[in-house]
Amino acid sequence: MASTPALQVHSARLWDSLMALAQIGATDKGGVRRLALTELDRQARDLVCGWFRDAGLKLRVDQIGNVFARREGSNPKLAAVATGSHIDTQPSGGKFDGNYGVLAGLEVVRCLNDAGLVTKRPIEVCIWTNEEGSRFTPVMMGSGVWAGAFSLEHAQQARDSAGMTICAGVRFSIHSPRNSMADCASAPASAAN
Protein backbone atom coordinates (compact mmCIF):
# COMPACT_ATOMS: atom_id res chain seq x y z
CA MET A 1 0.00 0.00 0.00
CA ALA A 2 1.42 3.36 -1.04
CA SER A 3 1.78 5.95 1.66
CA THR A 4 0.01 9.27 1.32
CA PRO A 5 2.34 12.28 1.32
CA ALA A 6 2.02 14.47 4.39
CA LEU A 7 0.31 17.75 3.69
CA GLN A 8 2.21 20.82 4.74
CA VAL A 9 0.40 24.13 5.15
CA HIS A 10 2.68 26.91 4.02
CA SER A 11 1.89 29.47 6.70
CA ALA A 12 4.11 32.11 5.08
CA ARG A 13 2.30 31.72 1.77
CA LEU A 14 -1.10 32.00 3.48
CA TRP A 15 0.07 35.03 5.46
CA ASP A 16 1.46 36.69 2.33
CA SER A 17 -1.85 36.12 0.54
CA LEU A 18 -3.78 37.61 3.47
CA MET A 19 -1.50 40.66 3.59
CA ALA A 20 -1.65 41.20 -0.18
CA LEU A 21 -5.46 41.10 -0.12
CA ALA A 22 -5.52 43.41 2.92
CA GLN A 23 -3.70 46.08 0.90
CA ILE A 24 -6.77 46.54 -1.29
CA GLY A 25 -8.84 49.05 0.65
CA ALA A 26 -6.32 49.35 3.49
CA THR A 27 -7.05 52.11 6.00
CA ASP A 28 -4.51 54.21 7.88
CA LYS A 29 -5.48 52.48 11.15
CA GLY A 30 -4.64 48.97 9.92
CA GLY A 31 -8.12 47.92 8.88
CA VAL A 32 -9.74 47.43 5.50
CA ARG A 33 -12.67 49.20 3.84
CA ARG A 34 -13.80 47.21 0.80
CA LEU A 35 -17.54 47.32 0.27
CA ALA A 36 -19.23 44.78 -1.99
CA LEU A 37 -19.23 45.35 -5.75
CA THR A 38 -17.10 48.48 -5.71
CA GLU A 39 -13.86 49.18 -7.56
CA LEU A 40 -11.91 47.88 -4.56
CA ASP A 41 -13.99 44.71 -4.46
CA ARG A 42 -13.36 44.26 -8.19
CA GLN A 43 -9.61 44.57 -7.60
CA ALA A 44 -9.78 42.08 -4.72
CA ARG A 45 -11.79 39.60 -6.79
CA ASP A 46 -9.30 39.94 -9.64
CA LEU A 47 -6.40 39.22 -7.28
CA VAL A 48 -8.00 36.21 -5.61
CA CYS A 49 -9.34 34.78 -8.87
CA GLY A 50 -5.84 35.09 -10.32
CA TRP A 51 -4.61 32.96 -7.43
CA PHE A 52 -7.43 30.50 -8.04
CA ARG A 53 -6.39 30.18 -11.68
CA ASP A 54 -2.73 29.81 -10.72
CA ALA A 55 -3.80 26.86 -8.53
CA GLY A 56 -5.55 25.27 -11.52
CA LEU A 57 -9.10 25.96 -10.36
CA LYS A 58 -11.93 26.47 -12.83
CA LEU A 59 -14.09 29.50 -12.10
CA ARG A 60 -17.83 29.99 -12.32
CA VAL A 61 -19.79 33.08 -11.35
CA ASP A 62 -23.51 33.03 -10.65
CA GLN A 63 -26.07 35.75 -11.33
CA ILE A 64 -25.60 37.42 -7.95
CA GLY A 65 -21.81 37.45 -8.32
CA ASN A 66 -20.83 34.50 -6.12
CA VAL A 67 -17.58 32.90 -7.30
CA PHE A 68 -17.07 29.13 -7.28
CA ALA A 69 -13.47 27.98 -7.85
CA ARG A 70 -13.41 24.23 -8.50
CA ARG A 71 -10.67 21.63 -8.28
CA GLU A 72 -11.91 18.42 -9.84
CA GLY A 73 -11.66 15.16 -7.98
CA SER A 74 -11.17 11.68 -9.34
CA ASN A 75 -14.97 11.32 -9.41
CA PRO A 76 -16.41 14.63 -10.66
CA LYS A 77 -19.94 13.23 -10.39
CA LEU A 78 -19.73 13.39 -6.61
CA ALA A 79 -20.88 16.51 -4.79
CA ALA A 80 -18.06 18.91 -4.05
CA VAL A 81 -16.64 19.63 -0.63
CA ALA A 82 -17.05 23.39 -0.36
CA THR A 83 -15.36 26.02 1.76
CA GLY A 84 -15.06 29.75 1.59
CA SER A 85 -16.45 33.01 2.84
CA HIS A 86 -16.50 36.60 1.61
CA ILE A 87 -13.96 39.30 0.79
CA ASP A 88 -16.18 42.36 1.19
CA THR A 89 -15.86 44.22 4.49
CA GLN A 90 -17.74 46.41 6.90
CA PRO A 91 -16.96 50.13 6.48
CA SER A 92 -14.30 49.71 9.18
CA GLY A 93 -13.48 46.05 8.70
CA GLY A 94 -10.48 43.97 9.58
CA LYS A 95 -7.91 42.09 7.53
CA PHE A 96 -9.10 38.61 8.37
CA ASP A 97 -12.91 38.48 8.61
CA GLY A 98 -14.10 36.60 5.56
CA ASN A 99 -10.75 36.86 3.83
CA TYR A 100 -9.30 34.09 5.96
CA GLY A 101 -12.13 31.72 5.08
CA VAL A 102 -11.52 32.17 1.37
CA LEU A 103 -7.74 32.12 1.51
CA ALA A 104 -7.55 29.17 3.92
CA GLY A 105 -9.59 27.19 1.39
CA LEU A 106 -7.19 28.26 -1.34
CA GLU A 107 -4.24 27.22 0.82
CA VAL A 108 -5.73 23.74 1.25
CA VAL A 109 -5.95 23.43 -2.54
CA ARG A 110 -2.38 24.69 -2.93
CA CYS A 111 -1.19 22.10 -0.38
CA LEU A 112 -3.00 19.30 -2.19
CA ASN A 113 -1.42 20.46 -5.44
CA ASP A 114 2.05 20.67 -3.84
CA ALA A 115 1.69 17.09 -2.58
CA GLY A 116 0.34 15.85 -5.92
CA LEU A 117 -2.81 14.51 -4.26
CA VAL A 118 -6.06 13.99 -6.10
CA THR A 119 -9.14 13.94 -3.91
CA LYS A 120 -12.07 11.67 -4.69
CA ARG A 121 -14.56 14.54 -4.47
CA PRO A 122 -14.18 17.90 -6.17
CA ILE A 123 -13.31 20.84 -3.93
CA GLU A 124 -14.86 24.28 -4.37
CA VAL A 125 -13.65 27.49 -2.78
CA CYS A 126 -16.45 30.06 -2.73
CA ILE A 127 -16.53 33.84 -2.53
CA TRP A 128 -19.98 34.97 -1.41
CA THR A 129 -21.20 38.36 -2.66
CA ASN A 130 -22.33 41.10 -0.27
CA GLU A 131 -22.13 38.97 2.87
CA GLU A 132 -21.56 41.93 5.17
CA GLY A 133 -24.54 43.86 3.82
CA SER A 134 -22.73 47.17 4.27
CA ARG A 135 -23.62 48.39 0.81
CA PHE A 136 -26.75 46.43 -0.11
CA THR A 137 -29.33 44.82 2.15
CA PRO A 138 -30.07 42.14 3.16
CA VAL A 139 -26.88 40.76 4.69
CA MET A 140 -25.62 37.38 3.51
CA MET A 141 -27.12 38.10 0.12
CA GLY A 142 -24.93 35.87 -2.03
CA SER A 143 -25.08 32.83 0.21
CA GLY A 144 -28.74 33.50 0.97
CA VAL A 145 -29.69 33.42 -2.70
CA TRP A 146 -27.57 30.31 -3.26
CA ALA A 147 -29.12 28.50 -0.29
CA GLY A 148 -32.65 29.55 -1.23
CA ALA A 149 -33.23 31.76 1.84
CA PHE A 150 -34.56 34.40 -0.55
CA SER A 151 -35.02 34.65 -4.29
CA LEU A 152 -32.61 36.02 -6.84
CA GLU A 153 -35.37 38.37 -7.97
CA HIS A 154 -35.72 39.76 -4.44
CA ALA A 155 -31.97 40.28 -4.11
CA GLN A 156 -31.78 41.97 -7.51
CA GLN A 157 -34.11 44.71 -6.24
CA ALA A 158 -31.51 45.86 -3.70
CA ARG A 159 -30.09 49.36 -4.12
CA ASP A 160 -27.27 51.09 -2.29
CA SER A 161 -27.55 54.56 -0.73
CA ALA A 162 -26.70 56.18 -4.10
CA GLY A 163 -29.45 54.23 -5.87
CA MET A 164 -27.20 51.74 -7.71
CA THR A 165 -28.79 48.33 -8.08
CA ILE A 166 -26.94 45.20 -7.14
CA CYS A 167 -27.31 44.10 -10.79
CA ALA A 168 -25.33 47.15 -11.91
CA GLY A 169 -22.75 46.39 -9.22
CA VAL A 170 -22.42 42.80 -10.42
CA ARG A 171 -22.00 43.97 -14.03
CA PHE A 172 -19.33 46.46 -12.95
CA SER A 173 -17.40 44.20 -10.59
CA ILE A 174 -17.82 40.84 -12.26
CA HIS A 175 -18.63 41.17 -15.92
CA SER A 176 -16.66 44.27 -16.88
CA PRO A 177 -14.44 43.60 -19.92
CA ARG A 178 -11.40 44.81 -17.97
CA ASN A 179 -12.10 42.28 -15.24
CA SER A 180 -10.25 38.98 -15.30
CA MET A 181 -13.49 37.25 -14.32
CA ALA A 182 -15.37 38.37 -17.44
CA ASP A 183 -14.45 35.08 -19.14
CA CYS A 184 -15.77 32.88 -16.31
CA ALA A 185 -18.50 30.39 -16.95
CA SER A 186 -21.84 31.41 -15.54
CA ALA A 187 -23.71 29.35 -13.00
CA PRO A 188 -27.27 29.39 -11.72
CA ALA A 189 -27.74 31.38 -8.52
CA SER A 190 -29.07 28.46 -6.52
CA ALA A 191 -27.79 25.34 -4.85
CA ALA A 192 -30.75 23.50 -6.34
CA ASN A 193 -29.56 24.00 -9.92
For each of these PLM feature ranges, what is it?
Residues 94-96, 134-141:
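Short acidic, glycine/serine/threonine-rich loops at helix termini
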Residues 123-124, 138, 142-169:
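A glycine-rich helix N-cap at a beta->alpha junction
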Residues 15, 23-27, 165-193:
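Active-site-adjacent substrate-binding region
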Residues 1-9:
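Basic/polar N-terminal segments that are highly enriched at the extreme N-terminus
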Residues 21, 83, 93-131:
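Alpha-helical metal-binding/catalytic segments enriched in His/Glu/Asp
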Residues 8-93:
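Acidic/His- and Gly-rich active-site-bordering loop/insert found
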Residues 68, 132-135:
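Flexible loop/turn segments at secondary-structure boundaries
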Residues 55, 76-81, 118-123, 188-191:
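Short coil/turn connectors at secondary-structure junctions
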